[in-house]
Amino acid sequence: VSDDFFMYDQSPAARVGIYYYENGAYPRKPKVIYDRNHSSFFSLDIDEIPEEVYTASKCFHTTGITLALNEDIRETTIEMIKRFKAAGTLVSFDVNFRGNLWTGDQARECILRILPYVDIFFCSEDTARLTFLKTGTAREMMKSFTEEYPISPLEI
């Protein structure tokens, strides 16, 4: 991990997204509250990212959570993935599906768009079955991903 490319939001409304974790007391589960709307990340424009970020990086990692946040972030992230890949950077992606952010159909449609650019792929067995409609053993499901896309699966 490098800090060579920090970006600062200079706008007067700049703010960092944050989350709050509330412990649960049995039988209530813990609760996480996300406060990320209108954060600087939500207003990131692809043209604000210096070209050197793509060419100097060795690995770029992102998740399905990022893609699920909203359409602007999704398209910016997809374009970043393409630019990192074009620059020869290793692209790592963790599906990390969250049903409270988008549907399985939405996730599948979007993620299938980026898989041709992904080198390292993380996907749970449940997500492979429910979101990508894969069948068979965990090994067979991951093999099917590698037969369809140029990825190295690390988890199922």
What spans do the regions from the language model cover?
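Conserved N-terminal subdomain of the carbohydrate kinase-like
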Residues: 1-64
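Short beta-strand/loop segments at the ligand-binding rim of alpha/beta enzyme cores
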Residues: 87-95
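Conserved phosphate/ATP/ADP-binding segment of small-molecule kinases
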Residues: 87, 101-156
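Surface-exposed amphipathic alpha-helices with a cationic face
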Residues: 78-85, 146
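Active-site glycine-rich loop that binds ribose-phosphate moieties when present
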Residues: 42-49, 75-79, 105-110
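Active-site beta-loop-alpha junctions enriched in small/polar residues
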Residues: 37, 65, 96-100, 126
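Glycine/threonine-rich flexible loop motifs
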Residues: 66-75, 103, 131-134
